[in-house]
Amino acid sequence: SLLEFGMMILEETGKLAVPFYSSYGCYCGWGGKATPKDATDRCCFVHDCCYGNLPDCNPKSDRYKYKRVNGAIVCEQGTSCENRICECDKAAAICFRRNLNTYSKIYMLYPDFLCKGELKC
């Protein structure tokens, strides 16, 4: 769920999901369109695509369990949906960490009307 994803983001990046990733660029937050603005926004685009591959799951509300082993995120065994949601969230949180050096505050609270066009997964 968004709760676990938010914790993963905080643990990986040291930043709170809200406000740092909740409406960043064109893809972080609800929905998305256009070309991602930077590497962090691209993490969100890929995350949206990952969720899009889970049509029978509820990624924003389905809870899952994960732990850390030697600092690494390990998704714990759950239902098929829980496992796949956790893996999507894990990949995004790691992607955010890997791209912290290019995170730009100019894309925080980015206005939706500046995001034009469609990009397919």
Swiss-Prot record:
Disulfide bonds join 26-115, 28-44, 43-95, 49-121, 50-88, 57-81, 75-86. One of its GO terms (molecular function) is calcium-dependent phospholipase A2 activity. It is an enzyme of class 3 (hydrolase). Keywords: Calcium, Disulfide bond, Hydrolase, Lipid degradation, Lipid metabolism, Metal-binding, Secreted. Expressed by the venom gland. CDD domains: PLA2c. Its EC number is 3.1.1.4. Ca(2+) binds at residues 27, 29, 31, 48. This is Basic phospholipase A2 3.
